Amino acid sequence: MASVKLGSKDQRIINWLLEEDQPSVRYYTLVDILGRKENDPEVREAYSRIPRRGWAKDILKLQKPGGYWERREPSWRKDVLGWIEFLYRPKYVATNWRALVLSDLGLTSKDKRIRKIADLFFDYKLRLGSPFNFFTEEACIVGNTARMLTRFGYSDDYRVKKLYDRLLEDQREDGGWNCFRPDRGTLDNWEPLAAYAALPKQKRTRKIEQSIAKGAEFYLQRKLFEEGKSKYAPWFRFHYPTHYYYDILIGLDLMTKLGYAEDKRLRPALRILNDKRLTDGTWLLDRVHPDLGPGAGYDLDVKKVRRLALEEPGKPSKWITLTALRILKRVEAAS
């Protein structure tokens, strides 16, 4: 990986990201931005601290002994609706949503607490023959689960491979995916491409590579944000955790990670990314999902939803800034 050319402002931002309060951000900055190797002593030290300090520690300390958060496991193992409630509700603090964040932060099955999470999904969600399993679920759910379990270290498990098979089957003719319409894809359904991006390149089959190319073209044709008659305002705001919501930052991260950093059709979205950069070199966390801000166009009973926030919205964000710098580095390396 090419080294980053840093100006004085950039170096201040790097130093900020390297602070030890969030070892996950420090680890990814060392590896993805500064190009350090995994066997580098500082990299190894930062990685070892991820479950012991910062966001991951805060999430893990709330985990129940059985590996879950919030609701108890259904007493009857074939209680399908009970398992859905158990894994997914309340949004966005139940087991599924917290597990997705832990997978983003870099934790793997080397940690027994992560193995407990995976066991819950394997026990119910991926059981063949379940009346509500990966054969009947939406691509957003399948993609998120495949991404999470792949990052946890289960990409070789046959049950995870079945998830990828399902994503291949569910891709629309236009190259996209859609949880709600069978006739066409939508930019909102980015989770399958995120699952592909999590899969090491050497483990991608020819069919997956073809699906990536078709899916990437779907996004590039739309410049990552052109869908419908008018611009959808929340897509132009940056968020984390993302859950299953889309924005331009997600699109840029996926396209550059999947090898399309040189494509000229990214330029409008890259201009938006650069325009949103503050004078001090950072980027804001604009909103925490669900984003009900201007232009959202929908209402939600907030009593049924609990936001999962790692950082304060409206302020410079280490996670958003790290993601933006990753994108810009890939573009620079490809040029």
Where are the regions a protein language model picked out?
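Preference for long, amphipathic alpha-helical scaffolds in soluble/luminal domains
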Residues: M1-S335
